[in-house]
UniProtKB/Swiss-Prot annotation:
Biased composition (Basic residues): 301-312, 763-777
Keyword Hydrolase among UniProt keywords: yes
Compositionally skewed regions (Basic and acidic residues) per UniProt: 1-23, 787-810
Region described as DEMETER: 497-595
Ranges for region Disordered: 1-29, 137-242, 280-317, 739-810
Gene transcribed to yield this protein: DML2
The name this protein goes by in its record: DEMETER-like protein 2
Similarity comment: Belongs to the DNA glycosylase family. DEMETER subfamily.
One GO cellular component, as annotated: nucleus
Record remark: domains: The DEMETER domain, which is present in proteins of the subfamily, is related to the J-domain, but lacks some important conserved residues.
Length: 1332
């Protein structure tokens, strides 16, 4: 009775908080029992069984009554929606009891818990026979409204309602069997609430094998087992705290067949029918697929080893198809599984891994077979139709999956755990969106593992895998920071920018259109005055630079080479982005591979190529003087050549020739002549030349345009007058005569990517061409259709009127371009492969030659010499691959027009010397730390408006000196600032010195170096000569008074003692015929003071100056002890970057040069002979030093080539030496090379390859009286002059010679220097490492 009272109290409490349920009529006792069962809260310790202690009425009820009570529950409508197959057959009680063990099967729980579209009952019952015991007792404390069960078993003695017996189609059946998605959540919440209210008595129970509901009659074995288990379940009074599952027998075969009903996207539900054979039948009418091994019961544990987790997983609403596909994870048709079916942490443990992974594929081969069975073949894909919401790669209409349990042998424990872990990771069930990164991080790595990874982290090692030059990368900055392990963020280096003012940009645009625009000199009076000052300043800078460089780098005035315009265009292709010695070697390879058949006499270099000289007119274009300027060693003249046409009209063509070449004549005739006196090959004027004025002594008449210029033209001789132009300084009037008529204004547009230029030509003769073009909007510019220019019309215009240029020896091609054009591009690329960028350059060269043939009919660009400079510039810019710098090189060096190319050397020098102002640099960046320099085009924008008024000769020499100065002194890396003659004006040097001195205060005026200079016999007081520091750290100018004060003599107190001469040698006394030794002091007589001639010739010879009048020499040269101690120069001096060879200058008529080509007339460099040291071989790096044992023993000469002592003795006895011939580069190139030979130095020679390998035996008597010089051999001019003093560099260019390559006279190809002549230190190190 006490128990019943407690039950009633609980019942009252529950009624107060739960809605009333419908009462079952006719069964009052059972109704109260079920109410007690419904509202009874079971403790969390045990909720596995029905509590019989709290339900006393249940002890007195028989099984029939219990079944009748269950049948009454079914009759109220709780079983509506169950499958028809399960309702038609009777199922024993034990099957109902054992069916709860299928909770671990995903198909009996989560995927079958789909709500169905049926009428829900307002009653809420505890014993829903459609639910498994696991679902019945495993509930939570939540309270929800009851939902109709999914599957209802037919109970004995009762039948379903009329609605259940109503036949329905497959689609309706699937809908009733599944339920609506919205009701699934409510029903599961209700079950959790019911489970939380139950109490399970602690009864011991026998392990029961799980059974599967199936259609038809059950097997006998299953029915017998069901009877036994049901009787045990009815009579048991005690249960264990922890019930253990029983594994099915391994021979038991179970398979599941699915039924898919294809509905709309919102009504896609499927019903599942469990057959008695263990299959799940689907409602589809298609054929069943073959059974496939699948992990259907992968989470059935081996036994109850721990308490079941109370909190369940989150539920999802995935259909049965997606849940099935989530197990296989096969891409688009992957099985989707809810989180409710995921195994717990205890189930994933390695201890139970065998039971968990029992039905999964053991390897990838079985997985492959599984996928082959699931994914249909092409035949099956054709006939199947998939719903819109499902993937269309697999057919999931019918799947018959089979699970086989076989007895297996015991495996290795370690291997099993490892494989189980791998398989578990591979088959881990995931959400549809995938596992988050945070979950992966937490599962994969622990704190200790992360700490270990950070300890093993190496930034240097990890940085190797990162791409370079990435702005977000972290790198170690410099060595000082690298030692401290400091990390700085990498930032891309930015180039400094030139500070361009608007006026400079305006004039630059005008100069790009025409050099004779009115606005070039300024738009107003103030601007004109400003431009005049700017240009005068830059003219002074240019002249000062040229004057200093002449002293150091030698004379580099204009001297024309042979070659055509096509040669120069191809030459600028090859000189892009590479050193000059590499590009020149590439061109020499092309010339050797495609030689030109010379029709001219090889000895014509010593003949006058224009031999018909009748008159030569000397023209001095200097307006200040009326006489010609003094001739230098190799002066340059402007020759006037006549070309007679059919009408006897003479077109005088201005060409360039040296003093050793003959000049063409001007025949006197009373006829019209078109004279081209401009040295830049532009038409100047049409002039009526009077024959009498040509022969007479008067001035040549000119038109009004050249009235000012005519004043400076005078006739020097009447019989033979030379036409000479002093172009070192040209008045501004000459520049205005660049062309006679104003050219048509053009608007030029350049496309760098496609390298094609088009222009819009506007013909307007009324308006001046110097007007500034109007700016167009971008839209109008895009809409305007650009027309291509007909360049062939420009050629026809230049050749019209019989003015076509005929090819001469000086304008002949140096390469057979037609043969090169017909050659395969790959062959051309292989020829210039040593230069680099060979494939791209080969394509550009061939495309350029094809363009000439296509547009002009021949490979000839000599007509560009006769067109206006602006037109020539536009045409060259239209060639693919030529930029502004390349075009300016062709115009200045080949067409001889006014231009100034700015290459990398010129741009770097202009910035360092301060010629080009830069925008303010960052505080931490100093001038000497600059690694990148402004864009060359911006440098040219600033320089060209200020240098455009210079003449072509000055611009040529300035350009030649600047590029050589950049190679020798002002290199990009480690410039030779100590020996630089321009360091007083260099900002780079000032910044480096100031940084080295840590910005010390400026030196005071008294901080100067004083040198006492004493005269030997003078009684005057010593004079102090003050040398200011070469570094100008301050720019303040001193007054003249201050300078004069510093030069005042200093009076010494006491005075320095005079030198005493106690004893003199007899040689110190002068001798005379009449008076011998009359003077005690040989230095008293001023007439006999030794005279030292400081010139080039006397400086190299040690002969005494002979007085021819007296017959004997009274002048003696005092040889100091220091001079006497200077050793004799060796034949070969090997250094790190260069090798010095003692060479002899060979005259042109020397017998040694028999078989060599005659030296070019314009070539100022002679042939040289380099002597071999006895015992040297071709590969000898150092002179031999070993001694011969055979010669020391019996004075017998050996026959070894490397024996120094024996070979020296043999050469001394035979009076012969071995030598190699050095050929002048201009002679080796036969006087023709692109870009006027600026690739080479003025004193450059090539080593004859034949005599370098097989030296020539030369008698010593033929060379003992020859002039001796020093030849510097190395890999490049920069490496040769690196680290030398300014005196050594000066001697190198003025007295010495440079050699960087060999030359094969047979095939005319460049060769590398043999090791005897020069071997780089890199090759020496490589050889030493190889020998070690």
């Amino acid at each position: 009775m006490e128990v019943e009272g407690e039950v009633r109290e609980k019942e009252a409490r529950v009624k107060g908080r739960q809605p009333e349920t419908e009462v079952l009529h006719g069964l009052p006792q059972e109704q109260s029992i079920f109410n007690n069962m419904q509202h009874n809260h079971q403790p969390d310790s045990d909720r596995r069984r029905l509590s019989l202690e709290n339900l006393p009425g249940l002890y007195n009820m028989s099984c029939t009554q219990l079944l009748a009570l269950a049948n009454a529950t079914v009759a109220t409508g709780s079983s509506i929606g169950a499958s028809s197959s399960s309702l038609s057959s009777q199922h024993p009680t034990d099957s109902w009891i054992n069916s709860w063990k299928m909770d671990s099967n995903p198909w009996t729980l989560s995927k079958m818990q789909k709500q169905q579209y049926d009428v829900s009952t307002p009653q809420k019952f505890l014993c829903d026979l459609n639910l498994t015991p696991e679902e019945l007792v495993s509930t939570s404390t939540q309270r929800t409204e009851p939902e109709s069960p999914q599957i209802t078993l037919k109970t004995p003695g009762k039948s379903l309602s009329e609605t259940d017996h109503e036949p329905h189609d497959r689609i309706k059946k699937s809908v009733l069997g599944t339920g609506s998605p919205a009701a699934v959540k409510k029903r599961k919440i209700a079950r959790n609430d019911e489970k939380s209210q139950l109490e399970t008595p602690t009864l011991k129970r026998k392990k029961i094998r799980p059974k599967v509901v199936r259609e038809g009659k059950t097997k006998k074995a299953s029915s017998k087992a069901g009877i036994k288990k049901s009787s045990i379940a009815a009579t048991a009074t005690k249960t264990s705290e922890e019930s253990n599952y029983v594994r099915p027998k391994r021979l038991t075969r179970r398979s599941i067949r699915f039924d898919f009903d294809l509905q709309e996207e919102d009504e896609e539900f499927c019903g599942i029918d469990f057959t008695s054979a263990g299959h799940v039948e689907g409602s589809s009418g298609e054929e069943n697929l073959t059974d496939t091994t699948l992990g259907m019961f992968g989470h059935v544990p081996k036994g109850r080893r721990g308490q079941r987790r109370s909190n369940g997983f989150k539920k999802t609403d995935n259909d049965c198809l997606s849940s099935m596909l989530s197990l296989v994870n096969t891409g688009p048709g992957s099985f989707m599984e809810s989180e409710e079916d995921r195994p717990s942490d205890s189930q994933i443990s390695l201890g139970r891994q065998r039971s968990i992974m029992a039905t999964r594929p053991r390897n990838f081969r079985s997985l492959k077979k599984l996928l082959q069975r699931i994914i249909p073949s092409k035949r099956d894909r054709k006939g199947c139709k998939l719903p819109r919401g499902l993937p269309k790669l697999t057919v999931a209409s019918k799947l018959q999956l089979k699970v086989f349990r076989k007895k297996r042998s015991q495996r290795n424990r370690v291997a099993s755990q490892f494989n189980a872990r791998i398989l578990d990771l591979q088959w881990r069930r995931q959400n549809p969106t995938g596992t988050s990164l945070a979950d992966i991080w937490e599962r994969s790595l622990t704190i200790d593992a992360i700490t270990k990874l950070f300890e093993e982290l190496d930034i240097n090692k990890e940085g190797l895998c990162l791409p370079h030059n990435r702005e977000t990368a972290l790198i170690l900055y410099k060595k000082s920071y690298e030692e401290q392990k400091a990390i700085v963020k990498y930032s891309k280096k930015q180039k400094p920018k030139v500070q361009l003012d608007p006026e400079t940009s305006r004039v630059w645009k005008l100069l790009m259109s025409s050099i004779d625009c009115d606005g070039v000199d300024g738009s107003d009076e103030e601007k004109r005055k400003w431009w005049e000052e700017e240009r005068n300043m830059f003219h002074g800078r240019a002249n000062s630079f040229i004057a200093r460089m002449r002293v150091v780098q030698g004379n580099r005035t204009f001297s024309p080479w042979k070659g055509s315009v096509v040669d120069s265009v191809v030459g600028v292709f090859l000189t892009q982005n590479v050193a000059d010695h590499s590009s020149s070697s590439a061109y020499m390879d092309l010339a050797a591979e495609f030689p030109v058949e010379w029709n001219f006499n090889k000895g014509s270099c010593h003949e006058e190529w224009g031999s018909s000289v009748t008159q030569e007119t000397i023209l001095n274009l200097d307006p200040r003087t009326g006489v010609s300027t003094p001739r230098i060693r190799n002066p340059t003249r402007v020759i006037i050549e006549e070309i007679d046409d059919d009408e006897n009209d003479i077109d005088a063509v201005c060409s360039q020739e040296s003093s050793k070449t003959s000049d063409s004549s001007i025949t006197s005739a009373d006829q019209s002549k078109t004279m081209l006196l401009d040295p830049f090959n532009t038409v100047l004027m049409n002039e009526q030349v009077d024959s009498q004025m040509v022969k007479g002594k008067g001035h040549i008449p000119y038109t009004d345009d050249l009235n000012d210029l005519s004043q400076g033209i005078s006739m020097v001789s009447s019989a033979s007058t030379h036409c000479e132009l002093n172009l070192n300084e040209v008045p501004p009037e000459v520049e205005l005569c660049s062309h006679q008529q104003d050219p048509e204004s053009t608007i030029q547009t350049q496309d760098q990517q496609e390298s094609t230029r088009t222009e819009d030509v506007k013909k307007n003769r009324k308006k001046p061409t110097t007007s500034k073009p109007k700016k167009k909007s971008k839209e109008s510019a895009k809409s305007t259709q650009k027309k291509s220019v007909d360049w062939d019309s420009l050629r026809k215009e230049a050749e019209s009127g019989g003015r076509k240029r005929e090819r001469t020896e000086r304008t002949m091609d140096t390469v057979d371009w037609d043969a090169l054009r017909c050659t395969d591009v790959h062959k051309i690329a292989n020829i210039i492969i040593k230069r680099g960028m060979n494939n791209m350059l080969a394509e550009r060269i061939k495309a350029f030659l094809n363009r000439l043939v296509k547009k002009h009919g021949s490979i000839d660009l000599e007509w560009l010499r006769d067109v206006p400079p602006d037109k020539a510039k536009e045409y060259l810019l239209s060639i693919n691959g030529l930029g502004l710098k390349s075009v300016e090189c062709v115009r200045l060096l080949s067409l001889h027009q006014i231009a100034f190319p700015v290459d990398t050397n010129v741009g770097r020098i202009a910035v360092r010397l301060g010629w080009v102002p830069l925008q303010p640099l960052p505080d931490e960046l100093q001038m000497h730390l600059l690694e990148l320099y402004p864009v060359l085009e911006s440098v040219q924008k600033y320089l060209w408006p200020r240098l455009c008024k210079l003449d072509q000769k000055t611009l040529y020499e300035l350009h030649y000196h600047m590029i050589t100065f950049g190679k020798v002194f002002c290199t990009k890396v480690k410039p030779n600032c100590n020996a630089c003659p321009m360091k007083a004006e260099c900002r780079h040097y000032s910044s480096a010195r100031a940084s080295a001195r840590l910005a010390l205060p400026e030196p005071e005026e008294s901080d100067r170096t004083s040198v006492m200079i004493h005269e030997r016999r003078s009684k005057r007081k010593p004079v102090v000569v003050n040398f200011r520091p070469s570094l100008f750290l301050y720019q303040e100018k001193e007054q003249e008074a201050q300078r004069s004060q510093n030069c005042e003599p200093i009076i010494e107190e006491p005075a320095s003692p005079e030198p005493e001469y106690i004893e003199h040698d007899i040689e110190d006394y002068p001798r005379d015929k009449n008076n011998v030794g009359t003077s005690e002091d040989p230095w008293e007589n001023k007439d006999v003071i030794p005279t030292i001639i400081l010139n080039k010739e006397a400086g190299t010879s040690h002969d005494l100056v002979v007085n021819k009048e007296a017959g004997t020499s009274h002048d003696l040269v005092v040889l100091s002890t220091y001079a006497a101690a200077i050793p004799r120069r060796k034949l070969k001096i090997k250094e790190k970057l260069r090798t010095e060879h003692h060479v002899f200058e060979l005259p042109d008529h020397h017998s040694i040069l028999e078989g060599f080509e005659r030296r070019e007339a314009e070539d100022i460099v002679p042939y040289l002979l380099a002597i071999w040291t006895p015992g040297e071989t071709v590969n000898s790096i150092q002179p031999p030093k070993q001694r011969c044992a055979l010669f020391e023993s019996n004075n017998t000469l050996c026959n070894e080539n490397k024996c120094f002592q024996c070979n020296k003795t043999r050469e001394e006895e035979s009076q012969t030496v071995r030598g190699t011939i050095l050929i002048p580069c201009r002679t080796a190139m036969r006087g023709g090379f692109p870009l006027n030979g600026t690739y080479f130095q003025t004193n450059e020679v090539f080593a004859d390859h034949d005599s370098s390998i097989n030296p020539i035996d030369v008698p010593t008597e033929l060379i003992w009286d020859l002039k001796r010089r020093v030849a510097y051999l190395g890999s490049s001019v920069s490496s040769i002059c690196k680290g030398l003093s300014v005196e050594a560099i000066k001697y190198n260019f003025q007295e010495g010679y440079v050699c960087v390559r060999g030359f094969d006279r047979e095939n005319r190809k460049p060769k590398s220097l043999v090791k005897r002549l020069h071997c780089s230190h890199v090759a020496i190190r490589t050889k030493e490492k190889t020998e070690e």
